[in-house]
Amino acid sequence: MSRFFATGSDSESEESSSADEITPKAAGTTLRQQALLLSDDEEDTKRVVRSAKDKRFEELTNLIKTIRNAIKIRGISKCLEEFEQLCRAFVKSKTIVDKEGVPKFYIRLLADLEDYLNQLWEDKEGKKKMNKNNAKALSTLRQKIRKYNRDFETEIASYKENPEQSADEEEEKDDIGSGSSESDDDDDDDITAKSFMKKKPQEEEKKAPEASKFLKGAADEESESDDDEDSEDWASDSVGSDSESEDNDGTAASLAVVFLKKDVGEKASDRKKDDRRRRHKKKERIEEEAEEEGEAEEGGWEKVKGGVPLVKEKPKMFAKGTEINTGVVVKKLSEILQARGKKGTDRAAQIELLHALAGIAAENNLGEGILVKIKFNIIASLYDYNPNLAAFMKADMWKKCLDCIDELLDILFNNNNIFIGENIAEDSENLAISDQPFRVRGCILTLVERMDEEFTKIMQNTDPHSQEYVDNLKDEGRVCGIIDRLLQYLETKGSTEEVCRVYLRRIMHTYYKFDYKAHRRSLGLQGETKSEQDQEESEGDDSAIIMDRLCKFIYAKDRTDRIRTCAILCHIYHHALHSRWYQARDLMLMSHLQDNIQHADPPVQILYNRTMVQLGICAFRQGMIKDAHNALLDIQSSGRAKELLGQGLLMRNMQERNAEQEKIEKRRQVPFHMHINLELLECVYLVSAMLLEIPYMAAHEFDARRRMISKQFHHQLRVGERQPLLGPPESMREHVVAASKAMKMGDWRTCHSFIINEKMNSKVWDLFPEAKCVREMLVRKIQEESLRTYLFTYSSVYDSISMETLSEMFELELPTVHSIISKMIINEELMASLDQPTQTVVMHRTEPTSLQNMALQLAEKLGGLVENNERVFDLKQGVYGGYFNRDQKGGYQQKQGYQRGDQKGGYQQKQNYQRGGYRNQNQSSY
C-alpha cells in the first residue's frame, strides 16, 4: 500500500496535541485575545523580523545567483559588475563573517568562478568569438579574481580537495531559514553543475507546497525531518516568529514557554541526534530505491542517472523476413543519406550504418555495383565527419578512409565492367546484376584529391617536433601508393583532364624530395651491403625520369593554365634541387612566368617563391654568385621570407588581418617536412652579397653616387659597426659581418676562417648534399674576390706588382691571377697594364689619390653651397609686394637667371678643364 494513503487520525491527534502544547493560556486570558490568537489571516500578514545575519547572507546569495545566471549565458561583462557588487556586500558583512566565519557558498563561488575564467582564458577559439566588451571584461575579471582569492587560499584549497563534503556542510550548517533562500541555493547548485560540469548528488527532494503539508500522513517521516531541520537550523528565525505569535497572545506564560523552550546543551544534543537520524534515513532511502530498481520488471519506469550514457541497441536495418535485394538496399541507403548534414545527426552512427549496409550487401551477393556506391558514400561521410574546414581528421577516421579507398580501388581493378563518372545520372545507374555493365555515379579522383588535402591538414596541425609527426609522415607512402594506383586506373579509363589532375598530385609528392640513390649512382657509388645493392637494382626509374614524363604530358595535354603553371614550377624546383642549373634556368626563362605570376592565386605564388629560392641556392652551389643574388633578392629584401614561402605567419602583421583571414592563411602553409631552411637561405644570400658588395665598395670608395647592391647586407654591416665592444662572432650574421671586414683589408685567410668553421658547417654548409664541393667553391671565390678587393684598395700604393707575388699571397694559380687582372683591365675597373716578359702589373696612376679625392669632394660641396645661397638671395630680392608689374619682375628674374647660368657654366667648365688638365699631365708623365 502506498505511503500517501496512510490514516489521518494519528496526524490529527499529533496536530491537536502540538497545538495544545504550543499555546498554553493563563487564567486572565480573554475571548478577544483567543480570537486574535486563532486569526491565521492576520498572522500571515504580519511583518517578519529577521536578524542582520539573515539579511546580509540573503543579499550575498542573491548576488551569487545573478553571477551564476550571467555565467550560464556567458555574459562576462555582467559577471564583472555583479562581482564588484558582491565584493562590496561582503565588506558590509565583515562583522558577521568575523563571528560566524566565511560562508561555504561564498568560497564555492570564488573557486568555481576562477576555474571558469581560466577555462575561458585557455579557449583561444572562444576568445576570438567574444565581443569587445566581454573580452575586455574577461581579462579584468580574471585579474581581480586572482588577486581577490589570495585572501581565501586555504578555504578554496580545502573546498577543492572535497567539494561534495563542503557542499553538504554548507547545506547543514550555513543554510538560511527562509524557503526562498533555500530555493535560491538549489538553483545556484544547478547552475554550478551545468556551468562547470561537476555532478553533485541531489540530497533533498523538492518540498511540497504549504497547503499539502497538512494533508500528509504520520508515516511521512521525511517531511517531518525536513520540517524539523527548517525549524531548527537557525534559532533566530524560530525565536523571531514565535515571539510575534506570543505578542499577539499577550500573555507572560506563553513568552516563558517560548524563551524557556530548551536548554542550550539539550538543543545542541538534539541537533546532533537529528543530523544522525536524517543521514541514516537518507542512506536507507537510497538503498530502498536501489532495491526497487533491481526488482523492476521490463516496461516499468527506469531511473536515468545524469552523466552516464545509455547503451543503445543497434537499430535493425531490415525487418525480420524481409527479402534483401538491390532495390531494398538502395532504398535503405537513401534513407540513411537523407539525415546527412542535418542538425542533430550522429555522424559516427551514420558511418556505422553504412558499414553494416555494405556488409549486408556483400553477404547477400548483390553485386559489386551496389558495393561501389555504398563505399563512395562511406568515404564521403568520413570527410563530412568534421564540418569545420579548418579541422583535421582524427587518426581512427584517417585509417578508415585509407582502408575504404584501397577497398574501392581493389573492386575497380578486379571488375572491368564497372563504369563510374560524375556525368552518370542517378536514374540511369545500373546497380543490379545483369548482362549490362555496372554504371555508378561518382568520381574516384575527387575522393583521392580530398584524401590528399586531408593528409596535408593532418601534417599542418601536428607538432613537427613530436614523434606523432613522424608517425603521420609514414602514411605518405600509402598516400602515394593510392595515387599511383589511381594513376594506372585513369590512364586506361579516365579522360585527359582527369589524367592531368592525378599527374599533378603525383608531381606534388615528388618535386621537393632529393633522390639520394640517383645521386649515388651518378657519383659511381654503390650500396655498402648486398641488400642495399639489390634494392637499388630492383627499384624503378629515377625521380628525374618520372618528373620529366609526367610534366611533359601536362605541357602537351593540359588546357588549364593553373595545372601547367604548377607543373612547370615543380619541374624547375626539381631540376634546381638536383643541381641541374642550366635546365632549370632555361625552363624558367622560356616559360615567362615572372611576367604574370602576380595574377595567380596565393598557393601558386607560394610555389613560385619556393622555386625562385631553390633556383638561387642551386646557382650558389654552382658558383654563379650574381645569379644566386638576383634570384634571392626579392624574397630576402622584403623581410617576409617566412610568410612568402608559406612557412609561418609574422606576428607584426597579425593586426592587419582578422580571424577569418588568419585561418585561410594557415591553411595555405606548407607542411614542415617541405620547408626550406631559412637560416641557410639567409646565409647564402648574405655570402653572395658579400662577394659582390665588398669589391664594389672598394672600387667606388670615393664615389658619392655609389649605389647599394644589397640593402640588407649594408644594414648588417651598420649593425656590426654600432656595437661598442666586438667579441668573437656567434650567430651566422656575425660570422658574415666579420668575414666582410676581413675581406675589405684583403685578408682572405681570416675571411675564410669566419665563413668556413665547425659552427658554420653544422648550421649551414653540411646541409647541402655536396657539402665538400660547396666549401671548395667558397674558398676559391673568397680568394678571387679578396684579390680584386686588394687591387682596388691598394692600387694607389703600388707602381707595379708581380703576378707571382699575388699568386703566392692569395694561393691562386698564376693563370687564374692573370685571368682576373685581365678582366679588370678590359672592364676598365683597374687602370693598369700587363708586362708579359716580366709578368708584372704596371699601375697607370690615372685615379686621384685619397687627398685629391677629398679636395674634389670639398670643391663640389662648396659649389653646391654657393648655388643654394644665390637661389635664396634671388628669392628674397625678387619679392617686392606687387610694386613692380609682372613684366618688370619677369625681366629681372630672366636677367638674373641668365647671369647665374653663365656663371654656373663657366665654373663647371673651369673645374672640368682643371681636372682634365691634371689627368693629361699625369698621363704624359708616364
From Swiss-Prot:
Keywords: Cytoplasm, Initiation factor, Phosphoprotein, Protein biosynthesis. GO terms for cellular component: eukaryotic 43S preinitiation complex; eukaryotic 48S preinitiation complex; eukaryotic translation initiation factor 3 complex. This is Eukaryotic translation initiation factor 3 subunit C. Residues 220-235, 287-299 have a biased composition (Acidic residues). It is found in: Cytoplasm. GO terms for molecular function: RNA binding; translation initiation factor activity; translation initiation factor binding. The gene is eif3c. Component of the eukaryotic translation initiation factor 3 (eIF-3) complex, which is involved in protein synthesis of a specialized repertoire of mRNAs and, together with other initiation factors, stimulates binding of mRNA and methionyl-tRNAi to the 40S ribosome. The eIF-3 complex specifically targets and initiates translation of a subset of mRNAs involved in cell proliferation. Component of the eukaryotic translation initiation factor 3 (eIF-3) complex, which is composed of 13 subunits: eif3a, eif3b, eif3c, eif3d, eif3e, eif3f, eif3g, eif3h, eif3i, eif3j, eif3k, eif3l and eif3m. Residues 890-919 have a biased composition (Low complexity). Pfam families: eIF-3c_N (PF05470), PCI (PF01399). Residues 200-210 have a biased composition (Basic and acidic residues). Residues 1-27, 157-251, 266-300, 890-926 are annotated as: Disordered. Belongs to the eIF-3 subunit C family. PANTHER family: EUKARYOTIC TRANSLATION INITATION FACTOR 3, SUBUNIT 8 EIF3S8 -RELATED, EUKARYOTIC TRANSLATION INITIATION FACTOR 3 SUBUNIT C-RELATED. It comes from the Eukaryota. Residues 274-283 have a biased composition (Basic residues). GO terms for biological process: formation of cytoplasmic translation initiation complex; translational initiation. Residues 672-848 form the PCI domain. SMART domains: PINT. The keyword Cytoplasm applies.
